[in-house]
Curated annotation (Swiss-Prot):
GO terms for molecular function: protein-lysine N-methyltransferase activity. Keywords: Cytoplasm, Methyltransferase, S-adenosyl-L-methionine, Transferase. It catalyses: L-lysyl-[protein] + 3 S-adenosyl-L-methionine = N(6),N(6),N(6)-trimethyl-L-lysyl-[protein] + 3 S-adenosyl-L-homocysteine + 3 H(+). Methylates ribosomal protein L11. Transmembrane segments: none annotated. The keyword Methyltransferase applies. It is found in: Cytoplasm. This is Ribosomal protein L11 methyltransferase. Disulfide bonds: none annotated. GO terms for cellular component: cytosol. It comes from Erwinia tasmaniensis (strain DSM 17950 / CFBP 7177 / CIP 109463 / NCPPB 4357 / Et1/99). Its EC number is 2.1.1.-.
Amino acid sequence: MPWIQMKMNTSGAQAEELGDALIENGAVSVTFQDTHDNPVFEPLPGETRLWGDTDVIGLFDAETDMADVIAGLEHHPLLGSGFHHKIEQIEDKDWEREWMTNFHPMRFGQRLWICPSWRDVPDPNAVNVMLDPGLAFGTGTHPTTALCLTWLDGLDLAGKTIIDFGCGSGILAIAALKLGAAAAIGIDIDPQAIQASRDNAERNGVSDRLSLYLPHQQPDNLIADVVVANILAGPLRELAPLISVLPKRGGHLGLSGVLASQASGVCEAYADLFELDAVAEKEEWCRITGVRR
């Protein structure tokens, strides 16, 4: 079934109000899109940030009388008669199949593959993590996840303990376990991430070696051979006193979720306790690694 799309441009301050107006006039969904394709990073908790120049896009059933919709919107105080808009028809697709075709097995480093369950494993003798996109962030497609996976693949993890701080889907902890780590601990503030990590660990046969905690549940005096935190620059700086003491002396630390432009500030927060390596970059993102002094 085809759909009808209406697009309007406005300021970020007015976008949500116009989105509500579209819903009130029959839109089945509303999305916000930056007119200039600039991302928004690290909104504060409880804050909905939109761009200064925002496209508000409403999706309508194909049978909708758009003349009635336009007439209804013209009464809105932000619009008025003759407001600027664009209407086009969009053909329907098999969105589930379309979505699935975008995910392929991906290789990281020399040994590690991340494979969606509906794809054949390219190399049965490699280290294969079976992982489908789901509730929690982390499938290997984002540059920060890729940087962390490549780093883990290059470490000797045999018999080691790893902490995945901000575990999301559990991809990093699970990859470490399949690369030879003896045990892993995943910590996340989101209960859905804890559940996603648990489900993914079971699917990969490593659930008996993965312990998962919300922050208030984690044991005191946690310590590990390897600590990885793929979160964001702000939390990495703020939580540096907590994260810095998780690796044992001589242990490895890997940090990502950091824009290359933010690297120096994050490095400064960890420089006292770690011998830091050169920053690794991928696209506009980076990874910071080091060894605990």
